Amino acid sequence: IHYDIGDCLRSCCNPAGEETLSLENVCFDIDLCQAILSGYLSVAEGFLSDWDLHYLPDCIRLIPLELGLRFLTDHLDGNVYFHCDREDHNLHRAAVQFRLTESVEQQMPELRQLIDRLVKRQGIIS
């Protein structure tokens, strides 16, 4: 569950996209996150445990970090796993994911508060 929702938010909440050439435009949009999680929690409340909810903010941070490491590793290994359009493609992809991770980390207190509010609003016991 954590990997799926974490990857969804990683992908959807970066308005600059995964292939942007402008690292300064990479950010985690907490408003998009709120909209997605509001809908997700309204359906997922029936199967999410208290621990699932507790670790939700951490998975949002973990997934871009993990993908950034995978892109960086592939770059160092000669770009053998991910398809590349140019030699530094995976290196740049890694930088985008690391910048996204940084943005998530900077907003972690707000992200935790957001999830707490959504959980309470949905009436999910946590």
Over which residues does each language-model region extend?
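Active-site activation/catalytic loop segments of kinase-like enzymes and analogous catalytic loops
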Residues: 2-46, 62-81
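Intrinsically disordered, low-complexity coil segments
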Residues: 44-51, 123-126
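Sparse, context-dependent recognition of short Cys/His-centered cofactor- or disulfide-binding micro-motifs
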Residues: 41, 57, 86-89
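All-alpha amphipathic helical-bundle segments outside canonical DNA-binding/catalytic cores
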Residues: 48-60
